[in-house]
């Protein structure tokens, strides 16, 4: 008899101040030039849409969305390196896009490193397309800089 092994349930919820140590830890393990704990705290204090994805009651990823004037900007989307390749990034992105739609956002923007092929593939799959390039946007190793690809996705048009 073949048994099916079920994946542990995941839950997406609002990020709270108690999540910041785990979020900061994931950020440090994911990026060479990570956001500081204070940047995450400031995002919460500013009222940005901050969410976490939990697996087995442990934060496995997070996303941060800024909304203003009918536009949204995905500021950060990250999955713990130990939990990648399970579709959690896509689940987080779907949740962020749902928040944007609920806020009647017309267009969502983000920056991504052109070297981050996994993220680029996910964003393209979800309908984002390149609209610009920001030269020398990201810090890179050995004092170098890396450009950012600016991606956008149109959501439903809302009448004013």
What are these regions (language model features)?
Residues 79, 113-114:
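Short amphipathic helical patch at the helix-1/turn junction of helix-turn-helix
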């Amino acid at each position: 008899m073949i048994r099916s092994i079920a994946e542990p349930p995941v839950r997406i919820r609002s990020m709270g101040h108690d999540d910041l140590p785990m979020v900061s830890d994931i950020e440090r393990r994911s990026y060479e030039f990570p956001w500081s704990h204070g940047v995450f705290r400031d995002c919460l204090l500013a009222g940005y849409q901050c969410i976490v994805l939990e697996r087995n009651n442990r934060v496995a990823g997070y996303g941060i969305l800024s909304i203003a004037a009918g536009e949204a900007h995905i500021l950060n989307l990250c999955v713990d390196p130990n939990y990648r390749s399970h579709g959690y990034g896509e689940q987080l992105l779907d949740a962020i896009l749902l928040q944007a739609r609920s806020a009647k956002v017309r267009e969502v923007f983000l920056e991504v490193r052109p070297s981050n092929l996994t993220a680029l593939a996910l964003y393209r799959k979800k309908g984002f397309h390149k609209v610009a390039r920001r030269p020398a946007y990201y810090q890179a190793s050995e004092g170098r800089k890396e450009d950012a690809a600016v991606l956008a996705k149109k959501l439903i048009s809302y009448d004013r």
